[in-house]
UniProtKB/Swiss-Prot annotation:
InterPro entries: Ald_DH/histidinol_DH, Ald_DH_C, Ald_DH_CS_GLU, Ald_DH_N, Aldehyde_DH_dom. The lineage of its organism: Bacteria, Bacillati, Actinomycetota, Actinomycetes, Mycobacteriales. It holds the Pfam family Aldedh. The keyword Oxidoreductase applies. Belongs to the aldehyde dehydrogenase family. Keywords: NADP, Oxidoreductase. GO terms for biological process: tricarboxylic acid cycle. This is Putative succinate-semialdehyde dehydrogenase [NADP(+)] 2. One of its GO terms (molecular function) is succinate-semialdehyde dehydrogenase [NAD(P)+] activity. It comes from the Bacteria. NADP(+) binds at W157, N158, K181, P182, D183, S184, G232, S233, L255, E386. The active site is at E254 (proton acceptor), C288 (nucleophile). Catalyzes the NADP(+)-dependent oxidation of succinate semialdehyde to succinate. Although it has succinate semialdehyde dehydrogenase activity, is likely to act physiologically on a different aldehyde(s). NAD(+) can substitute for NADP(+), but enzymatic activity is three times reduced.
Length: 518
């Protein structure tokens, strides 16, 4: 299967929220596998963002008035269109992001499952709910959920469909509009998803894609939005959080990670070695929840290292637009430089390469072998800093207690993986880890795919959560409507104020003793 045609890019380009697309300066988009130009994308400005917000605000008012079930119907139609167009979407993901096809398919599965989940649960989550009134039988209290308004989304290049539209879907079903800045390396992945949303019946002004540099477009979105969702580095997330704080708007972010795996005695090492190749090297390690540190109890460390090293050396790298390849490319020269730098620094300081360890320009300009290191010391760059590439280090430990201590010895806390002799033991270990998600007998997919449960990070790994009820309700303002029935707190029925005030405390104490009040 080839990369998408020029006609496809011409069609998608016109969906960008930019006036006079043909007259704008452009940025070249390359096919990652070859480094050859695919197409160009117009570069948006702050004025484009402001225009998109003006149109979005006008459209959002009507959208919020539509019944939730109608908004959900749009998302269901979008889900069905993703299923129908999955091969095209995978082609585009491979061309623009350099993924192996199975890694591209992970994104498609997420788009479908995410849309299905929020379309299914949004009516119940957003319906008004009763709350305990001040005085039972005399008052009525209801909690309603109002949309924030226009949500800003700033998305990364590594999962350019999942982390654009899947963060936007709950905002849209909650009654908001969205203005989104895709990463400059992968704008067409965002535009392709937007096209399907428009075809599903979403008014175009409600979902505006503005490509352009973060310093311009990202800043303008942060200046104008009513809520900001960001996925990217911890450093950038910190700056955006400060900006959002000054504006007193809500902010949610999934940020970096240095994710650990613990392998305890009794674990099935053949199974762990196979699963760890996916856990560590999905999307060439360019996955915020992928594993970069493996802690193995000493008496099984040698056997595990041998089995895992063999599995990694057998991985197939390639540029095929089919399922014959195990790992694709890094996305940019910057990523290749970081990965090479971390490995070179480690080996120069005494680390041992068990598998991989070098670039593969014979396959493509940005390919790097999946790499396994041992003898990694704290002073090495890869020991504590996120590589965000196909590099993982193995650390033998005396026991599970030491493994947990070292796994938690980080400022990050996004994802973790545990493998033990039994599910119960794995769950006990998992509960000791300081991490937003922990997978037992799996690397990352089960926690990510549990869409009814929250997903996010602790520490420098993020603020807030996506997925689950939290992933939708964060895009709303809760509104309490309390109604006084019969009488309010003024003296009723002509009772003198002095008598009424003396009666209030006994009344409150009586109410506190009612069922459900203690």
């Amino acid at each position: 299967m080839p990369a998408p045609s020029a006609e496809v890019f011409d069609r998608l380009r016109n969906l960008a929220a930019i006036k006079d697309v043909a007259a704008r300066p452009t940025r070249t988009i390359d096919e990652v596998f070859t480094g050859k130009p695919l197409t160009t994308i117009p570069v948006g400005t702050a004025a484009d963002v402001e225009a998109a917000f003006a149109e979005a605000r006008a459209a959002q008012t009507d959208w919020a008035k539509r019944p939730v079930i109608e908004r959900a119907a749009v998302i269901r139609r979008y889900r069905d269109l993703v299923i129908e167009n999955r091969e095209f979407l995978m082609d585009l993901l491979q061309a623009e992001a350099g993924k192996a096809r199975w890694a591209a398919q992970e994104e498609i599965v997420d788009l479908i499952a995410n849309a299905n989940y929020y379309a299914r649960v949004c009516v119940d989550l957003l319906k008004p709910r009763k709350a305990q009134p001040l005085l039972p039988g005399i008052g009525k209290t209801t909690v309603c959920y109002q949309p924030k308004g226009v949500v800003g989304v700033i998305s990364p290049w590594n999962y350019p469909m999942t982390l654009t539209v899947s963060d936007s879907v709950p905002a849209l079903v909650a009654g908001n509009a969205v203005v989104l800045k895709p990463d400059s390396q992968t704008p067409y992945c965002a535009l392709a998803c937007a096209e399907l949303l428009y075809r599903a019946g979403l008014p175009r002004a409600l979902y505006a894609i503005v490509p352009g540099p973060g310093s311009v477009v990202g800043t303008a979105i942060t200046d104008n939005c009513d809520y900001l969702m960001f996925t990217g580095s911890s450093a950038t997330g910190s700056r955006l959080a400060e900006h959002a704080g000054r504006r007193l708007i809500g902010f949610s972010a999934e940020l970096g990670g240095k994710n650990p795996m613990i392998v305890a005695r009794g674990a099935n090492l053949d199974k762990v070695a196979k699963a760890a190749t996916r856990a560590c090297f999905s999307n060439a390690g360019q996955l915020c929840i992928s594993i970069e540190r493996i802690y193995v109890e000493k008496d099984i460390a040698e056997e595990f290292t041998r089995k895992f090293g063999d599995a990694v050396r057998n991985m197939k790298l390639g540029t095929a637009y089919d399922f014959s390849v195990d790992m694709g490319s890094l996305i940019s020269e910057a990523q290749l430089k970081t990965v090479s730098g971390h490995v070179d620094d480690a080996t120069a300081k005494g680390a041992k390469v068990i598998a991989g360890g070098k670039a593969r320009p014979d396959i493509g300009p940005l390919f790097y072998e999946p790499t396994v290191l041992t003898n990694v010391a704290p002073e090495m760059e890869c020991a504590a800093n996120e590589t965000f590439g196909p590099v993982v280090s193995i650390y033998p430990v005396a026991d599970v207690d030491e493994a947990v201590e070292k796994a938690n010895d980080t400022d990050y806390g996004l994802n973790a993986s545990v493998w033990a002799g039994s599910t119960a033991e794995g769950q006990r270990i998992a509960a000791r880890l300081r991490s937003g998600t922990v997978n037992v007998d799996e690397g990352y997919a089960f926690a990510w795919g549990s869409l009814s449960a929250p997903m996010g990070g602790m520490g420098l790994s993020g603020v807030g959560r996506r997925h689950g009820p939290e992933g939708l309700l964060k895009y709303t303002e809760s509104q309490t409507i309390a109604t006084a029935r019969v009488f309010n707190l003024d003296p009723p029925f002509g009772i003198p104020a002095t008598v009424w005030q003396k009666s209030l405390l006994p009344i409150v104490r009586t109410v506190m003793k009612l069922p459900g009040r203690r």
